[in-house]
Amino acid sequence: MSIVTKSIVNADAEARYLSPGELDRIKSFVLSGQRRLRIAQILTDNRERIVKQAGQQLFQQRPDIVSPGGNAYGEEMTATCLRDLDYYLRLVTYGVVAGDIAPIEEIGLVGVKEMYNSLGTPISAVAEGIKAMKNVACSLLSGDDSAEAGFYFDYTIGAMQ
């Protein structure tokens, strides 16, 4: 839930107007909108590069997953792994745009551990892949923008552990 929605819901639950503090937080959120959109655009424009480089790093760090018997062994399973990384990158962009972890949590992380466990997919490898994406993505961003995006990558990584 965005800061705007949270503030309105809280104020309405108490049958009151928005407080000066709530209005300041909303103002700050609105003023940061261009920056958040810029970050999301950079990540979106570079998604293929981010996913490809992160996949290469992951497969070098974890050769077990691309070896016979590994979850990403073979062309089809490697493509599935990269597709999953792309999915998590997309979730990160949702979080950046919203300025909130709610889209990441509500759209993509509910039941993820159970799903990967049922498929026999090592969750640690998924987390390592997301961390590799963070490194690639943050190298494309300025320091402040990198910290902003990094927060959402870190949240996603943490949910995998």
UniProtKB/Swiss-Prot annotation:
(2R,3E)-phycocyanobilin binds at C81. It comes from Galdieria sulphuraria. The gene is apcA. It is a peripheral membrane protein. GO terms for cellular component: chloroplast thylakoid membrane; phycobilisome. Belongs to the phycobiliprotein family. The keyword Thylakoid applies. Heterodimer of an alpha and a beta chain. Gene3D superfamilies: Phycocyanins. GO terms for biological process: photosynthesis. Light-harvesting photosynthetic bile pigment-protein from the phycobiliprotein complex. Allophycocyanin has a maximum absorption at approximately 650 nanometers. Although originally identified as Cyanidium caldarium, these sequences derive from Galdieria sulphuraria. The keyword Chloroplast applies. It comes from the Eukaryota. Contains one covalently linked phycocyanobilin chromophore. Coiled coil: none annotated. It is found in: Plastid, Chloroplast thylakoid membrane. Signal peptide: none annotated. This is Allophycocyanin alpha chain. The modification N4-methylasparagine is found at N71. Keywords: Antenna complex, Bile pigment, Chloroplast, Chromophore, Electron transport, Membrane, Methylation, Photosynthesis, Phycobilisome, Plastid, Thylakoid, Transport.
